[in-house]
C-alpha cells in the first residue's frame, strides 16, 4: 500500500483508489481479503456498497457464520466414533512350547475354551494339570523312579520328549515335575526334584 502511493504523484489519486480504499477498510477487508481479528462488528461502519458485491456477501456472512464450531465438533465426533468401536484384540497363541524361569508355557487344546486362561495358564492351573497327568501316567513312572531316584532328570526329559511326540496336552504338562510326587520318600528325592524345578 505504501509502495503504491509513493510511486503515484500525491495529487493524482484516481477515483477507483479513493472509492476502493475507504469502503474496503470500513468493512474490514484489505486487498479482497477479510481481516478477522475479533474486533469487527457484525455490520461494517459504513453502509456504502463495496466495489465488488461478492466481497460484501462473503464479509457479511463471514461475520454472521457461527455454525463453524458445530462442524468442528462433528469432525471431532467423527474422530471419536472409531474409538467408540474398539478393535477386537488378537489372541496371542504359542506356536512352540517354551520355559521361562522354571515355568513351562505350552499350547493348550481345550474344547470350547474361548477364555484367555486357556492360552496362558497360571502356575496353579499348571500344577493341577500336572497332578492329573501324574495320576494318569505317574503309575508307570513310579516303578522306574523308585528303583533309581538318581535318574529322575533323564526320565523327566524322556517323558517330556515322549509326550511331545504323542501330542497329548496332559502329558506335555507332566514334564519334569512328573517324577516329583512319585517318590515321596528318600533323602535323594528332595534335591533332585528341586534341581528339576530350577531348570
From Swiss-Prot:
The modification Phosphothreonine is found at residues 14, 85, 148, 183. Residues 74-85 have a biased composition (Basic and acidic residues). Residues 1-199 are annotated as: Disordered. Its main location: cytoplasm. Residues 87-110 are annotated as: Effector domain involved in lipid-binding and calmodulin-binding. Controls cell movement by regulating actin cytoskeleton homeostasis and filopodium and lamellipodium formation. When unphosphorylated, induces cell migration. When phosphorylated by MAPK8, induces actin bundles formation and stabilization, thereby reducing actin plasticity, hence restricting cell movement, including neuronal migration. May be involved in coupling the protein kinase C and calmodulin signal transduction systems. This is MARCKS-related protein. The gene is Marcksl1.
